[in-house]
Amino acid sequence: MRAMVYRGPYKVRVEDKDVPAVEHPNDAIVRVTLAAICGSDLHLYHGLMPDTRIGHTFGHEFIGVVEQVGSSVQNLQVGDRVMVPFNISCGSCWFCARGLSSNCHNVNPNATAVGGIYGYSHTTGGYDGGQSQYVRVPFADVGPVRIPDWMHDEDAVLLTDAAATGYFGAQLGDIVEGDTVVVLGAGPVGLIAAQSSWLMGAGRVIVVDHLQERLAKARSMAYAETLDYDEHDDVVVELKKQTDFLGADVVIDARAPERYRGEREPVDPRAGHVPTRVSGIRPW
């Protein structure tokens, strides 16, 4: 099969690799029909992710068709069209039982702080990813979800990571009816977080960025108010002005991690919780 393979920092190429096989009775083999490139894949490409080994296949956002199932798999059948979440989890350990599946104890032999992730180095288990023609899916009864016939592939693939991350960020904010929500960053995850905030009852949603194209999408796609931080000396002060000097009830930070170190947050002191850091692995 063909796969996108890591060959060192700033070096990736499409190569021939063996088609993966069932290694455990709970495995499934999925033929990939669509894969996406995540912004975090750049961390691998730039050589910033520890223990990214030569020959590793990238890709943690993919959908496909089940080609083979192990003898213990009960919920999937050959021919099922499925979306596969980016993280791998057993569904039964202490963490999984408490909804913390990205910290699963049974899927990563190389670390204890994080569970398994497809195509994201041996630090997260060394599982080859979905930027390939086929992928082995462990614990196939736990992660994959059948895609309804009416859903297009281009929509379904967003559910593997980007859409789920934005929604989860809003969910972690414990938004209540009428809350003012500020979303920092108007990229895809930020836009989905803004849309999700409305679904959870927000009374106002304000998106902060400086790229005009993204701010325009925040207005047209997420129906949010927008703030261009290039136009203000102090964004926190400006946000407080726009909220009767109370600040936001919830802040969802959808920027790259290096962007928010040591910064003040425009949070209402009544809020009772810290800002939500949008991350599939480490909610703040």
Task: Give short role names for the model-derived ranges.
Residues S92-L184:
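NAD(P)H dinucleotide-binding glycine-rich loop of Rossmann-like/cofactor-binding domains
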